Amino acid sequence: EYETDNHSGMNVEEIAGLIFDYTSGYPFLVSRLCKLMDEEVAGSVSFPDKAAAWTKEGFLEAEKLLLSEKNTLFESLMGKLNDYPSLKRKLYSILFGGKKLVYNPDDPAVDIAVMFGFVKNDGGTLRIANRIFETRLYNYFLTTDEAQNSELFIFAPDDKLKFVQNGHLNMELV
């Protein structure tokens, strides 16, 4: 419908696929990404018109803008993490421990997270609902005081020097 009205020349199937891949159809995220592409990305230096904005690159720019903004959805997500420490621990273990947690609808924290669409039941396994939430949660957890003071963060810059030489990854060492 948008393409019919605006004639941006976008590949509708590709853009729709990207939007769904990143949002799993979460209405606020779909709407916000489209609005950002249309109003913020289009007309910028890198994307001078709607045709340039409604591309994969334009979509990725909109995603970057979305992930860096404060909005009611992300504030709600962070609020639920603070209100439900057990949910916070579960999401952390999924993201950083690779744990597969059993979906339990009787767990109040899980129940509230499902109700808000932050997580989902994927064949009996608790999963983060979409890539946008996953990335936002990664960003959040990586900037907590605990993460910043962990051995990984303290020693990572020194370890990087071992593996990256002259700006290139040394595959033999990896």
Predicted regions and their residues:
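Winged-helix-like regulatory helical subdomains adjacent to P-loop NTPase cores
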Residues: 1-116, 122
